[in-house]
Amino acid sequence: MIYYEICNKILAVQRREHTRKELIPLSKRKRGLLLLALLLALALGLWHLAIHPQPALTPVASERAPQGRVLLVPLDSRPPCRAHVAALGRIAGRDVVAPPGALMDYYSAPGDTAGLRAWLQETIAPGDTVLLSIDQLLYGGLLAAREHTATETAQDALVAYLRALHAAQPTARIYAFSILPRLTPQDTIDGYEERRALIAYSRLVGREAAGLAIDTAERDRLRAKISDASLAAYEGHFDENARLNEKLIALTEDGTLARLVLGQDDGEPYGIPNIEKYRLQQAIEASGARARVTLTHGADEIAQTLLAACVSEQQGFSPRVFVAYAEPAAAARVMPYMAVSVDATTDEKIRLIGGRRVDTPEDADLVLYLIASDAEKGSLDARAAACTALSGLVEREKPTALVDLSKHFDAREPLLPLLLARDFPLTRLTAYAGWNTTSNAVGTALAEASLALAAQRPDTSKEQREAGAMANETFLQGRILEDYFYLKEDIDPINRALRKAGYTNTADLDLEHNHRWATAMLQRRLAAQIAVYKQTRSLRAPFPVPGTDEMLAIYDLRASAGFPWPRTFEIDLTAQPFFARVAP
């Protein structure tokens, strides 16, 4: 590969030296120099092949007809809520069908709720599986749900719509999910000091509601800083959401909804949001649908985990998961934007995908390996042993999903760079995730791994297994490129460059006028990362197609990326690995 690159560079220089269409004959001296350069390049290429031998490869493309379809009304238009669900569906041979982009939300602009309801009503067919965001169908997306209100009349109209949808298509199964408001006040409460006081007040009230001792004088001092109107708007948001979710629980009880997931977004251990959560827990326990209603932490990953749960349910498959930690303390660690520990979150997500936890890796279909690095707690020392443990798992061909969490969301803490330095075969992981919160990353890793296992069930043909393996590897490489290379290495330099250009808030960019420049900067950095990464043994390592005697390898990797919303917080990345069969 290096040999060909050098030759191409030489030819490019030669082309630039000529101004006419026909090549000017080279002098004897130049021909000699060119020949010497080619011989040196050939020697370098042979040396490279000697220390990095390449297996015989036969290029192969994935060809598989979908085995079923899933209708998706996403939480919002961001990739984790929409594009990633579709990519995960391809692993298990499911065609995930989402509404046209014109009906969806875009950042602070809400989706067309009437248009979305009409689309779903026209598209749904007998036997369909539907993953349905209540926030999108009622408010027009997650951000709209945080800021807007839904009257009792609006809520009741949605309930009537869902009942009519179920009556028209009784064999379709509707898996709905609804998000609880977060602790942060709505943007309509915009006074800086008042917002700070309201957040602190909410935390104290939450502690008091949990039966803990608090400084009542401090609580009253904070209350005095908050206007009656702002407090009423803040508390009213939770009351409105609780009433809505109680109606959804009733819809699950009467069979309109096959399953309901209630997610707590950006949680904390104590706050007014938790008061609503406990109220809903009581309502779930008192209902006749408690086996089909799940209360979980997280939001953006819920459609992914529900997809995995649906496929497992259809196949009668309950993945057995062994959970391993890089260090014992990681299990009890509460990571940023979470209300519960890493282990409690992991338990929730295993149950959500329809799995069960087992006590030994030998009894497991899947090992979920978690590292929750915190440089301030000295946990980085555990990474060397984690590399060794992961190497042992892949050598035994044990399906392994790696969750690579970072307390400070920077490149100092993740495990991935150590794996690269040790030539660990990343292609042999079943799943990788390290984005945003614990619930986001654990949910994505479990969803990918569960769907990968579902794609390799005993009744699956060899062609389907191969297609599933390639779809899984494609999603895996996308997660590595985004969750580590972008979110841990590239986002900070990009934000610094934008600030130098005059942007003070990279969460609200004016990409309408600077889209090309910002996107070009992103693509340059991504291309530089890929140029190095695709030469590593970690990427080139062949990997087996489970249940067959075939081995595949990635012989090239490309990707495209842009900003789906006018902010740098996330990117819309599409990875394109090129696969080949490896000769025995």
What is the predicted function of each stretch?
Residues 16-18, 33, 46:
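Intrinsically disordered, low-complexity regions
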Residues 41-584:
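An N-terminal assembly and electron-transfer interface module characteristic of large anaerobic redox
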Residues 26-39:
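N-terminal Sec-pathway targeting helices
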Residues 3-4, 14, 18:
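Low-complexity, intrinsically disordered or signal/transmembrane-proximal segments
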Residues 17-26:
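Juxtamembrane low-complexity tails/linkers enriched in Ser/Thr-Pro and polybasic
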